[in-house]
Amino acid sequence: MTNIRKTHPLMKILNDAFIDLPTPPNISSWWNFGSLLGLCLIMQILTGLFLAMHYTPDTSTAFSSVAHICRDVNYGWFIRYLHANGASMFFICLYAHIGRGLYYGSYMFQETWNIGVLLLLAVMATAFVGYVLPWGQMSFWGATVITNLLSAIPYIGTTLVEWIWGGFSVDKATLTRFFAFHFILPFIITALAAVHLLFLHETGSNNPTGIPSNMDMIPFHPYYTIKDILGALLLILTLLALTLFTPDLLGDPDNYTPANPLSTPAHIKPEWYFLFAYAILRSIPNKLGGVLALLLSILVLIFIPMLQTSKQRSMMFRPFSQLLFWTLIADLLTLTWIGGQPVEHPYIIVGQLASILYFLLILVLMPTAGLIENKLLKW
């Protein structure tokens, strides 16, 4: 008798995706982040659902409802901080996942990569609208500053901003629609993630060497299920440590002050995972130029498959490209640090240099290194 998991229409899909999936035998722990992102997404949807049961998306009660969740709801404080720090874990996994893709040339699976970029944008949008919901000072001013960037669009800018606000400033209408977006987007992300997996399973996984491994594959279960469980346990352990010992480590103290349109915080800054893009935005003294640089800092990922000049897919055997890759990581860390600093000397010039280097590395230096490495190998 044939096993039910191979015949039942639903079980067959799960079987082909998580059990009998042929997988390269040499993929490292850098390939764990995909499953960890799935875990983060499930966790965020569940904690978010329980928070939504007690939260009220109204300017007069939003801040109080969050305080009520933390004080009066059973384990409400735990759910709230799991959700807030879960977002940070989500972005750590996301950036590691993208970094892995860049290093090992996974972007050569173009459909998978492009849907991945869409996923990144959707997660960033979700995190942004979610940060507005507690209606603290940083929520309000963050929403005001970022939505205001759209006014830089010629001709339709101002109308567009007022349309998004639902009025002439960030107010009740804005909060209500942001709550609606924050609720619906994770389900759109789930659907996109399923399509992301669908395209990945059309080609099979890449591996550290970048060489096709079709002739040497192993089943996903038990080898990689056990490996993913280990990764999941480490993720949960880290998240619990963060949530139970230092829940406010990554947050902003200003968000414990209720939103006040009449008082601007000394330093308006987003959550840590947006600081690199915020630094690029601030490094250009022109509003429209800054907005375009901000957009391009993320959308540049779409062009990466077109910028592949090397005849080798992975960076595993390419020392020049490796050096530039780690320079890019250091540059992104520098931008993240600059994004959290006030706009004054020497931070301004450091931010401008780091922004120039970011685009220079991706668009010029890395493709050039690929060509040089081809020459050195006489290819």
Curated annotation (Swiss-Prot):
Lineage: Eukaryota, Metazoa, Chordata, Craniata, Vertebrata
Transmembrane feature ranges: 33-53, 77-98, 113-133, 178-198, 226-246, 288-308, 320-340, 347-367
Gene Ontology process terms (BP): mitochondrial electron transport, ubiquinol to cytochrome c
Membrane disposition: Multi-pass membrane protein
Note: Heme 1 (or BL or b562) is low-potential and absorbs at about 562 nm, and heme 2 (or BH or b566) is high-potential and absorbs at about 566 nm.
Keyword Magnesium belongs to the record: no
Family: Belongs to the cytochrome b family.
UniProt keyword Repeat present: no
Mutation effect (D252N): In strain: Isolate South Africa
Entry binding sites for a ubiquinone: H201
Binding site for heme b b562: H83, H182
Primary localisation category: mitochondrion
Localization terms from the record: Mitochondrion inner membrane
CDD domains reported for this sequence: cytochrome_b_C, Cytochrome_b_N
Binding residues annotated for heme b b566, in chain numbering: H97, H196
Entries under InterPro entries matching the protein: Cyt_b/b6_C (IPR005798), Cyt_b/b6_C_sf (IPR036150), Cyt_b/b6_N (IPR005797), Cytb/b6-like_sf (IPR027387), Cytochrome_b (IPR030689), Cytochrome_b_C_euk/bac (IPR048260), Cytochrome_b_N_euk/bac (IPR048259), Di-haem_cyt_TM (IPR016174)
Cellular component, GO annotation: mitochondrial inner membrane; respiratory chain complex III
GO molecular function: metal ion binding; ubiquinol-cytochrome-c reductase activity
Protein name: Cytochrome b
Gene name in the database record: MT-CYB
Coiled coil: none
